[in-house]
């Protein structure tokens, strides 16, 4: 008794195209009970939960999809990392991004590294956050990233490195010069 996916695909597509997202979610929940091994449905259901602004279920579904190895695209990993951060699990967001930036699935660019640095910062891993802000600063040559790196290094009591980063921020014309000068003086 093999189930046919086609009627479900048509039904879900019809709901989606007529912007009946809640009905599409219900259909996808049914489909997943019948075809739990189909990775496409897991990813779609997670995305549809986000469309209807049920972020907790979206996170739970995409987290489960990830644990089953169903998330294979950069955008899917970044969405899951974002959901972890929004749901106050920045440590998981940081680990996920770090792993997939290292593997090459997620591009090692200033935007993704900045997101990674922010996640480590939110997770209170000051040393890692400072390291990634430093990498972003070297990549972009922007004062604000050197300033963030310097402030975090100072917080982590790595004063010599902090002064180097803060001086670089000043050299590049950081906006809040007074605050940076005060941090160096402290």
Predicted segments with their positions:
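Alpha-solenoid helical repeat scaffolds
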Residues: 1-186
């Amino acid at each position: 008794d093999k189930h046919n996916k086609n009627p479900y695909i048509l039904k879900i597509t019809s709901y989606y195209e007529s912007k009946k997202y809640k009905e599409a979610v219900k259909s996808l929940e049914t489909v997943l009970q019948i075809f739990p091994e189909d990775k496409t449905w897991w990813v779609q259901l997670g995305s549809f939960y986000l469309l209807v602004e049920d972020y907790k279920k979206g996170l739970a579904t995409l987290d489960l999809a990830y644990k089953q190895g169903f998330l294979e695209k950069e955008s899917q990993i970044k969405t899951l990392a974002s959901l972890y951060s929004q749901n106050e699990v920045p440590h998981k967001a940081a680990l996920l991004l770090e792993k997939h930036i290292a593997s090459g699935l997620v591009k090692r660019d200033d935007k993704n590294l900045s997101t990674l640095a922010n996640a480590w910062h939110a997770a209170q891993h000051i040393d890692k956050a400072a390291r990634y802000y430093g990498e972003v600063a070297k990549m972009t040559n922007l004062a604000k990233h050197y300033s963030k790196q310097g402030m975090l290094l100072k917080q982590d009591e790595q004063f010599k490195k902090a002064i180097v980063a803060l001086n670089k921020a000043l050299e590049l014309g950081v906006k809040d010069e007074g605050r940076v000068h005060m941090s160096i003086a402290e």
